[in-house]
Structure formats: C-alpha cells, structure tokens
Amino acid sequence: MQTALASRGRVGLVPTMGFLHEGHATLIRRARAECDVVVVSIFVNPMQFGPTEDLATYPRDLDRDLALAGAAGADFVFHPEAAAMYPAGFSTRVEVSGVSEPLDGAARPGHFAGVATVVLKLLNIVQPERAYFGEKDWQQLAVVRRLVADLNLRSEIVGVPTVRADEEAAHAGLALSSRNSYLSPEQQRRATVLSRALRAVQAAYAGGERDTGRLRQAGLDVLASEPELALDYLVVVGPDLRDVPQLSDDPLNRVLIAGRLFGVRLIDNMPLSTAPVPAPA
C-alpha cells in the first residue's frame, strides 16, 4: 500500500466497515476535494464487536461498495481479510482511557479498544495526511483524536457533519447508518424519534436553558412517544464528553443518544450551539 501511494501527494483515508451510503460518499467527496489521493478502507473489524453483537449479520455488499466509492472519487479501495489484519499470534490491543469509558464504552465493553486498534493499524498501513470520520459516531471521533494526539501520529483527523435523510423522505432527519438497513420503511420513520428528541434539546438550549437535567428532560419528553425504544442513554455533555450539571456557552457542547429500536441499536448526536466548531488543537 505505501509503495503504491509513494510520491502521489497528499493522501486522504476514509475508514469504513462497508455497506456504503450517502454519508460515506460525503466523506469520500470531502477527501477528494482536499487530497491528491483518496483511499477508502472497507473492513468489518471483528475486534470491535462484542460476543452477542451483529458481526456475522452485519450488512455487506462489496460490488455495490466499489461502485459507490469510485463514483464518489476514491482512487484505491483497501479491503483486507481479517487474517491479514490479525494474523496468528496477534496480541496487541490499544486502550484509550478516559474518553472511551462512558456511554458506548460502558454499553459495549471492549468496543473502543477494537476501534483504536484497527484505526492505528490503518493509519500505519496507509500513512495518510488526513483521515475522515463522520460526526455521527461522536465518541468514536473523540477516541480517535485522543489516540492520534497521544501517540504523536502524523495524520490529521477530520470530522464531517452527520448526513441525514432528506426532508422529503418519510424518515426525514434520521441519521444515515448501515444498520438502518435492518429496519423496515415504517420502522425507519419511527426511528426519527431520536433526531426529534435531539432537536428538542437543541431548541431548549437555543432558548437559554443551560441546566443539563432540564435539557435532557426536553429530549426524554419526545422519546416517551415511542414505546418500542429501549434507551441506553441520552446525555448532554460539554467538551471531551464531560458530564456537568450546568453548561457554559461552548461550541463543543453536544447531546448524544443511543438505544435499541425494534432490536436494532441506533446512535445519534447533535451540537447544541449553532456557532462554528473550532478545529481541534
């Protein structure tokens, strides 16, 4: 891989687990606009799945993925086998403490160690100047940024805003996700309760509310309309996912949600402020 990319200019990496959609295409197009060479990795990483999670059934369609990646501007697709990434005797796991521990870190033990390990391997293999991640996985983005900062890696991590279903769609506002394919059209429509709850929290914040308990309640009031939702968490946090009782006016304030709807685990988040988010130091 490094030999193929040598002397080609600025390299951008878009790491994915495949079953690509418009959210991934947005990442690829962003990389295309900013880099000389764009590499898309497709790897369903077994290390980030728990023993009862959907590794075996995670949606896959390589031919479709190759077509979408190429149409969006990818120059190379890196699609390794698990045995190549984790050969016999592989015994290293990368732990990013602190930011990886709450929320999905608590709900999915070992998940972020798997994420950090595979991201570090991909960054070492591809050696990109920039790597592009969706903000829909906000905690994952925070973990990857901490990993890169702590280990003095050369890659810049670029967060790209979440892509949502069009306003004309019955499921308007639903964050695009490969796991949405598990849901029927009607179930996807009902899954918009997550984004509606987040927008209710946004509205309360815009109205001047800074108490995190009352902000959270604004979202819970919306979620109460969906009896099939098993909520993992709805949290209002400051920078670095800090859970505080009272928010300051920080553009990094965020509301995050995760839960199971019709047996499918969904996550989403939104910024609370409409002010521009500063680039990470």
Swiss-Prot record:
EC number per UniProt: 6.3.2.1
EC primary class: ligase
Disulfide bonds: none
Catalytic activity: (R)-pantoate + beta-alanine + ATP = (R)-pantothenate + AMP + diphosphate + H(+)
Stored InterPro entries: Cyt_trans-like (IPR004821), Pantoate_ligase (IPR003721), Pantoate_ligase_C (IPR042176), Rossmann-like_a/b/a_fold (IPR014729)
Main location, first listed in the record: cytoplasm
Subcellular location: Cytoplasm
Coiled-coil stretches: none
Catalytic residues (UniProt): H24 (proton donor)
Residues reported in the UniProt entry to bind ATP: 17-24, 134-137, 163, 176-179
Keyword field contains ATP-binding: yes
Sequence positions that bind (R)-pantoate: Q48, Q140
GO BP term (any one): pantothenate biosynthetic process
Swiss-Prot/TrEMBL keywords: ATP-binding, Cytoplasm, Ligase, Nucleotide-binding, Pantothenate biosynthesis
Residues binding beta-alanine: Q48
Source superkingdom: Bacteria
Pathway: Cofactor biosynthesis; (R)-pantothenate biosynthesis; (R)-pantothenate from (R)-pantoate and beta-alanine: step 1/1
Pfam families the UniProt entry points to: Pantoate_ligase
HAMAP family the UniProt entry points to: PanC
Assembly notes: Homodimer.
Additional information: The reaction proceeds by a bi uni uni bi ping pong mechanism.
Biological function: Catalyzes the condensation of pantoate with beta-alanine in an ATP-dependent reaction via a pantoyl-adenylate intermediate.
Similarity remark: Belongs to the pantothenate synthetase family.
Record-given protein name: Pantothenate synthetase
Source organism per UniProt: Deinococcus radiodurans (strain ATCC 13939 / DSM 20539 / JCM 16871 / CCUG 27074 / LMG 4051 / NBRC 15346 / NCIMB 9279 / VKM B-1422 / R1)
The encoding gene: panC
